[in-house]
Amino acid sequence: MPLTRRQFAATLAGTAALPSFGAEPGGGTLVIAQASDPQSLTNALSTEGNIYTASSKLFDGLLTFGIDGKPQARLAQQWAWSADGLSLTLKLRPGVKWHDGQPFSAADVAYSVEEVWKKYNARGRSTFANVEQVETPDPLTAVLRLSRPAPYLLSALVSIESQVLPRHLYAGSNPLLNPHNAAPIGNGPFRFVRRERGSQIVLGRNPDYWDRGHPRIEKLVFRIVPDLAGVAAALETGEVQLGTVALADVERLQRNPSLQVSEIDQAFTASVNALEFNLDRPVFRDLRVRQAFAHAIDRGFILKNIYHGHGSVADSPIPPAMREFYRGDVPTYAFDPAKAEALLDAAGLRRNAQGLRLTLKIDPTPGAEAVQTAQYIRSALAKVGVKLEVRNQDFAEFVNRIYTRRDFDTAVIGGNSGPDPAIGTQRWYWSKNFQPGVAFSNGTHYASAEMDRALESAQTELDPAKRRQHYLQFQRLAQTDLPRIPLIAATRVVVSSKRLRNFINSAEGIYGNFADATV
């Protein structure tokens, strides 16, 4: 069962940081299984999920968040909003150094906001859209000036959302092509040591880390294990101490006395996996076709047989873990193949002599559950006369096909929806987030003036009750227009050795910095 907020809080309490002063490193090596070899090791420029685990150890965020939802100091020691919500002042921690010895300063923050997050990050484009400029009155003060309020902005200042990059290494370059993306100079508890493409990424303890006595582990090794069955086997033999496994293996691994299974359903890491349509394809411009696909898919079957009950059927683009904003009273599409057939007939897509209406392709994100979901959808759509070819490819080719070449009909895509709808969910539906080449953004090319107004109103509304109403309207529009079909609100399941302790030190879970972890 998913950890409740109270249970997760207890877990955090049990893994609380040791006192900084006088603490000594514990040493040792932690080996983490990673499903694929990321192209980049900084998520400042990308929201690809395979980047987060390693990148969050190399870069600290300006803030972090406790399980109680309250912000905590990291690179920023103090923060304050102006009364009108149009200025956010950050007082930075003195003495922080980049891994090359250069001082961390407000100039790095200003550069990252203005030249990186707003321009190149799929989530950052909407998250920081209201930030007009960043003033730096002194090296340890950054003042974000906004055109309109952004009540969610503090939530975006964590490492997994908005990593500050070193201005002295990026300014004047094309950030996307900067060689430091593959071998970062960060400011976090671990430093980049080396990578062996397709094999492993090695990080070492940062001896100059600002939090004295941390990190407590000497070395992190991210071992590339593309086969999830191989991850389970490596956990069982002790070859790796932390990893994500096929959900079909979880029940078996729970019985292993040397392992522990953590299932976390929290807003910071909540996700909705969905079927996306390429709305540039003429066939999908007809709403009846999209509705037919929704009625042809049994999401309960997917939850039971592919996700093995780890999550819930998604009836909204906002996952239930985001309790403040989730609403279930929106248009839904029950499993009804007969209705799907009638809608396809009404759209003029009648069966031919061979019983076929359409022949299309479906591209799943690389990963066991997405691929199995695509295979199930192929089977389900075949029953209503739609032939789908499942195309499998590596991660880089998938991203290029969907977001750069736009050479796809449908795709199975998952992505972090939190910690706030303006940060994680809006990117899929906001017309201004359509930009070929930017991964995991508005890949459907959905554009609706009414939707944009709802999202932009919610993005700036300071009254919590009014903001919830804007997001209710958003959910109703999303489920009415149906540019993507929410399938499963998945919980995050990780398996670890019981020797690994204190690795959760924030609401970011395994995407925290591991400064307190011991093995």
Would you name each region that the model predicts?
Residues N278, V313-A347, P366-Q372:
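Structural transition elements
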Residues K91, R125-Y170:
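Surface-exposed binding/hinge segments that line
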Residues A33-A83, E114, I185-N187, I306:
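N-terminal lobe/hinge region of extracytoplasmic solute-binding protein
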Residues Q77-N121, P137, V143-S147, A234, ...:
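Aromatic- and charge-enriched surface segment that lines or borders ligand/interaction sites
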Residues D37-Y52, L75-A76, Q102, L153-S162, ...:
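A structural "hinge/loop" feature
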Residues P207-L253, Q266, R378-S379, K387-E389:
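Ligand-site clamp/hinge motif
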Residues K70, V158-P215, K219, A229, ...:
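Gly/Pro-rich hinge or "lid" segments in bacterial periplasmic/extracellular proteins
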Residues A13, P151, E196-Q200, R205, ...:
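Detector for C-terminal structural segments
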